[in-house]
């Protein structure tokens, strides 16, 4: 690939975006950028520093002091791999509050776009195809039922040894769907030119094959 390639994958929480984006990234030699993990990193640091979502000025100063980049598909914050920390339930419950702040989104979107100017990238999130990479070469919107997404998250966390309750995860996903879809700034929605894929019951590799078939045309 001589010219830079950009791929946008959007969808609600637990639709399989990050797993699928990683595989597609490896297959097509694209840098995988998990934008959700960047918002989770902000949430992690805000909670550690007792900065509420209402304290926007403090949040922006905090973000300006955060050095974020990706190594082997994992987020490195100020020299530390924080991937195990940002997938904890407490972060999942609070991330929507911080991610809905206009100034926070502007800061992080600017950083994401700079990455896409340097490398061929695949990004997943809520507003990649509609906001971050409006001119992406390929746009996909992944969906799945709330129950299926809760089951995936439950198994993922239990597999990591985290004791969680399925019903709590399901309610959290339903709540996050509502917040993400109804927030004032850059709500979750499918880009008009995105290809929608329902991942319910298909399996990861089935979705990868579908996306690959579009990209190889």
Swiss-Prot record:
SUPFAM superfamilies reported for this sequence: P-loop containing nucleoside triphosphate hydrolases (SSF52540)
Stretch forming the signal peptide: none
GO MF annotation list: ATP binding; CMP kinase activity; dCMP kinase activity
Reactions catalysed, as given in the entry: CMP + ATP = CDP + ADP; dCMP + ATP = dCDP + ADP
Record GO cellular component, one term: cytosol
GO biological process, any: nucleobase-containing small molecule interconversion
Enzyme class (EC, first level): transferase
Protein name (Swiss-Prot/TrEMBL): Cytidylate kinase
Gene name linked to the record: cmk
């Amino acid at each position: 690939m001589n010219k830079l390639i950009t791929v946008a994958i959007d969808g609600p929480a637990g639709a399989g975006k990050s797993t699928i984006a990683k595989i597609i990234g490896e297959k097509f030699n694209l840098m995988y950028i998990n934008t959700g993990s960047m918002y989770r990193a902000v949430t992690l640091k805000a909670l550690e520093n007792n900065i509420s979502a209402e304290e926007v000025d403090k949040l922006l100063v905090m973000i300006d002091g955060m050095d974020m980049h990706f190594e082997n598909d994992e987020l490195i914050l100020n020299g530390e791999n924080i991937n195990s920390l940002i997938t904890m339930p407490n972060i999942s419950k609070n991330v929507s509050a911080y991610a809905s702040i206009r100034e926070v989104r502007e800061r992080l979107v600017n950083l994401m776009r700079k990455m896409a100017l340097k490398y061929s990238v695949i990004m997943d999130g809520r507003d990649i195809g509609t906001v971050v990479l409006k001119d992406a070469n390929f746009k996909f919107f992944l969906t799945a039922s709330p129950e299926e997404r809760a089951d995936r998250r439950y198994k993922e966390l239990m597999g990591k040894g985290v004791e969680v309750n399925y019903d709590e995860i399901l309610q959290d996903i339903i709540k996050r769907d509502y917040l993400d879809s109804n927030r004032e700034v850059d709500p979750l929605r499918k880009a008009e030119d995105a290809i929608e894929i329902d991942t319910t019951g298909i399996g990861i590799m089935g979705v990868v094959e579908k996306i690959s078939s579009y990209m190889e045309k």
